[in-house]
Amino acid sequence: MSRTASFPISRRAALAAPALLAAGHAVSQTAEVDVVIIGAGAAGLAAARTAQAEGVSFTLIEARDRIGGRTLTDRSLGVPVDGGATFIHFADRNPWTAIAAEVGVETRTGNWRSGGYREFSDGAPVEAGVASGQRSGRGGLWALMEDVDASNDVSFARLVANAPPEVVAAAQPMARGAVGEEPERVSVADYGRLYDGPNRVVPEGYGTIVERYGAGVPVRTGVFARLIDWSGRGVRVETDQGDIRARAAIVTVPIGVLKAEKVRFRPALPRETANAIDGLAMGALSKIALKFDGDRFGAAPDMHFVELRGARPGMSFEMWPFDRDVVVCWFGADYAREINRLGEEGAVRHMLERLVRIVGPEAEKAFRGGRHFGWSEDPFALGGYSYARVGHAGARDALRKPVADRLWFAGEACAGKASMTVGGAHQTGEQAARSIAARLRPR
């Protein structure tokens, strides 16, 4: 399938024309271009647009039948729902803040606490004193994290091993809810260095911004990269629709796909790069959207019902985001992997039953349908977003280093302090394309 401007800024437009022509060639023919870009998510689209602006010819391929990667605004329930990325994190320096304005998509200040929250334990309300202890526990957890860096890295579980009970309790929802992984697996040093700052939310969907941003980028969808051969002076990408030859490649596929060796490399990647991939992993943060008619169960728009204790801490129900008749359930770690294996019907039914335990049988009566976004079972992602394993806080920076001036990796996994975000993915795609352009210029 091909797409030029139908789905979901050039400084030298004349020089960009060869890029448009090259990218439009059928993949079954051998393409001779400056760079082949693998993956049309935020990083790949940013790389392609930067290549256009720099006068670098390119071919952009994408295995899915759409662009956007792990940004996905679903409209099947009658309203826009982000099944993937939701927040424009560190919005004061995130490129998507400006891009949203450029493509005409509204953003608003907001975060997950903007509508308030109620805390539960296995569906039962948590007493006020316990809830207060949980909040103070989060403060204690952040204080402990400040003393950790790459030289003394530990997991969240190890960090709080001798801490007060409320701090121990706070570590579980932070790891499972924010990273999407079990606390014993996540590097504190890596997570603690990520950018902080104001968030913005997108009523029409983050995915809508990315769709519009990529609307004019030539891309071949439904094309699977199988092998990247970098044994010669350039690269040869073997796909299910023929080979693509280029002077360099930008690889933007998620870490989950790289670790599963869905894309192979010939020769094998250098040890430093291979170790970097090994040092990263994918969390399983996922979502389920539930549509209701009429009853709001006494919850205000944007309120969160948070499961802090009990068997499954770290999951929450986002009630009526943007005052719409939808509840979005957020859940991660091994619990998410378990639920995602149920498939859409089973996963939706499970979360509806959990909500019924909190708000009562009225939810069952008002329910009108649901959608499941189980990223750990998505073959093109195999997870929600990346995290560093304990002792591997330097893996992201190592992965970003070019290989033999022919291979560049880009995406949220190698975005340093901007990792785990769409903004970080964009920055790395842009940086990779600029780096290649600089190397290709006559000296």
Which role fits each region the language model picked out?
Residues 3-7, 13-443:
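FAD-dinucleotide binding site
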